[in-house]
Amino acid sequence: MSLKDLINKNLSHWVAGQGPERDIVLSSRIRLARNLDTIPYPNRADKDSKEEVTKRVLDATSKQGKIKLHYIKMDDLPEVEREVLVEKHLISPAHAKAGEGKGVLLNDNETISIMINEEDHLRLQVLIPGLQLEGAWETASELDDLLEEKLDFAFSQKWGYLSACPTNVGTGLRASVMVHLPALNLTNNINKMLGAISKVGLTVRGIYGEGSEYVGNLYQISNQVTLGHTEKEIIANLKSVTSQIIEQERQARNLLLKEKEIEVRDRVNRSFGILSHAYQISSEEALRMLSNVKLGIDMGIITDVDTGVLSELMVLIRPAHLQKLEGKELTPTERDIKRAELIKTRLNM
């Protein structure tokens, strides 16, 4: 596969597309947890039960007619292909691990994914670029309604939608945004902001969800609970907090230009120099340097590189994407070399 093919055909819309506040908010995500009534949850289900879930879901999605979805059986994919789906945020790391009955449904531009037999029978996700929580919710809600016409979801009048995880009981809704906050980090305000978020019913994770590290100044902010709040309330709260975070990040960027312009320009250009000339580079270092360069582009320090290229590289430099591009398994050192080559090539395209 050529670099051009990988970029043009294998980048999800949330990476390559445009959206409101895109310089700070990389993506908006809505995820709904649903289970079929009378069938055990995946962690207690046998092979036949999981196959029955898959059969019912595929039958329901094929009959809804409005949204074209393609089914992928996880056991049919080699490990690197499963990891590519994780790196594109289309499936969870847990879903990529070997196990019977697992599958995923995707639409053409990968804004919609439905994991089958993950922690719940269905994890329906809509992922789009920029701050578009309402738009993502509208799409997710429409598909949820279409599926509920064909499937009997486990639902309690008292508790709402039932889930294998207590924190998902209620609406089953997890709304999240992925944000790039380098200036808050550079002005030493990031910990204060993260602490404030936890006090308003939200949580902050790394870019791959629970248990993942913060890298490249990227943070995933989402609601903590789904019980006792309507979907609109959850989304409105997250959007309001995100808007405040955006404003704080913009103020921090202005402060840096006003009080530390030389230091910021030096950091940005040093990072660009490393990315442009490194012979090998680790994923962690590359993400740090890309974060600095993206900040420089967004602040007008670098003017001859499209900020979209930086967003693309944040995905393309991951281990599975590099190995898919090369068409073979790579050692860590080989990945570091190929990562440096890819970055140099892409920055000069």
From Swiss-Prot:
One of its GO terms (cellular component) is extracellular space. Gene3D superfamilies: Glutamine synthetase/guanido kinase, catalytic domain. Its EC number is 2.7.14.1. InterPro entries: Arg_Kinase (IPR023660), ATP-guanido_PTrfase (IPR000749), ATP-guanido_PTrfase_AS (IPR022415), ATP-guanido_PTrfase_cat (IPR022414), Gln_synth/guanido_kin_cat_dom (IPR014746). One of its GO terms (biological process) is phosphocreatine biosynthetic process. A motif (RDXXRA motif of the pArg binding pocket involved in allosteric regulation) lies at residues 335-340. Appears to be allosterically activated by the binding of pArg-containing polypeptides to the pArg-binding pocket localized in the C-terminal domain of McsB. SUPFAM superfamilies: Glutamine synthetase/guanido kinase (SSF55931). ATP binds at residues 27-31, 89, 123, 174-178, 205-210. Pfam families: ATP-gua_Ptrans. It is an enzyme of class 2 (transferase). It catalyses: L-arginyl-[protein] + ATP = N(omega)-phospho-L-arginyl-[protein] + ADP + H(+). It comes from the Bacteria. GO terms for molecular function: ATP binding; creatine kinase activity; protein kinase activity. Residues 24-252 form the Phosphagen kinase C-terminal domain. CDD domains: bacterial_phosphagen_kinase (cd07930). Keywords: Allosteric enzyme, ATP-binding, Kinase, Nucleotide-binding, Transferase. HAMAP family: Prot_Arg_kinase. PANTHER family: ARGININE KINASE 1-RELATED (PTHR11547:SF38), ARGININE OR CREATINE KINASE (PTHR11547). Belongs to the ATP:guanido phosphotransferase family. Catalyzes the specific phosphorylation of arginine residues in proteins. This is Protein-arginine kinase. The lineage of its organism: Bacteria, Bacillati, Bacillota, Clostridia, Halanaerobiales. The gene is mcsB.
